[in-house]
Amino acid sequence: MSLVVGTGKAAHVALRGRRLRRTPALRGLVRETRLHPSMLVQPLFIQAGATGREPIAAMPGQDRLGLAALQGEAMRLRAAGVRSVLLFGLPSAKDAIGSGAWAADGIVQEGIRALRAVDPELVIIADVCLCEYTSHGHCGILAGSGDDATVDNDTSLELLARTAVSLAEAGADIVAPSAMMDGQVAAIRAALDEAGHGQTAILAYAAKHASAFYGPFREAADSAPAFGDRRSYQMDPANGREARREIDADLAEGADMVMIKPALPSLDLVAAARARTDVPIAAYQVSGEYSAVCAAAANGWLDRRAVALESLVAIARAGADIIVTYFAVEAAGWLREEARR
């Protein structure tokens, strides 16, 4: 249907969208999607045996943190208005079953207590997986050996549940199972409830793809698999209907929130999830998404601030209530600057 009636100077244009784009104040008044620091989650990497900060080469501006540096980072986040973190650990030792993941004195458990000491109101989300703690780098324990080794789904569930309980006992508000083991949410919910942690929420990595965008993270967390890949348990990025089934399954098992990862390549799934459920939806703007923007900006090809904010708006516009992003602190500062204008 034409939006122009008539021709020439007397033409009547039915839609004058530019009327509401004339000034920054008008554009702000009618903006449909609004970012706020409270919806941003900063991922943090906690390094055992360290006190300071160790830059992550593949992720400019991000560091591995010792416990003292972690507490300092909490103060920086608070000042920026970022009130939620997602924790990953780098243990001092690894073994075949990833026992450091559920140790009472594990690095993430110690990190949770350190954060609680300086910021009791911080929302602490703890990742639940074994890949950073296993000597082989897979997200569950192995059955078989050599070329016949496979990840044992059901045996891994017990260890993931034990890890979630340990993290809850340390003080995590939310546990986030990311191993993509079938039935992990149900196993974790049952274990939390049995241990008296009925108020600990579950943010399920419901649709986690076997993505090429995870490369920088695996350097940051020292979690690359020693052999093979994770395609037998992480999802094929080509499968949208399967992602919706995974989301439905995690909700049926007791997830309080669901996460989709990576974010920008999966905006269709974020939108589909938003139409499908009323629970909070998180999207993870992963390391490769972050580092690609950093690299392009460092070469002068893109405006770091503009591209980062536009990407976050796109994720929110698709339907995400929560965005896990390495830009969290920077974005919070940019949003405050915009609000003062």
Where are these regions (language model features)?
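Alpha/beta enzyme core
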Residues: 3, 23, 39-41, 47-341
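N-terminal amphipathic/basic leader segments beginning at the initiator methionine
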Residues: 2-31
